[in-house]
């Protein structure tokens, strides 16, 4: 695996780890929704994940991440359509999809 790709995978792994640090209780949507700092920190880390994934796909278009395109699209939506991203969308990404991405990243790094 390319050195750059390894670095971008590490960036994704670190961003996922930070998201889980910012949101230890994944059962309290109302607390998440009312905490602006946490929301922005998580959004920023999703942007980082999306940008790293975009860079990976530019050098390795066939890279085996099942949701790669959706991740990049979400990053673009947060950055360019920030007023169109609901708290529920961000919450759903973290609670329902992030752990699977984390497993994929760990598998690829081993």
Task: Locate each region found by the language model.
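Solvent-exposed interaction patches of small proteins and small membrane subunits
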Residues: 1-110
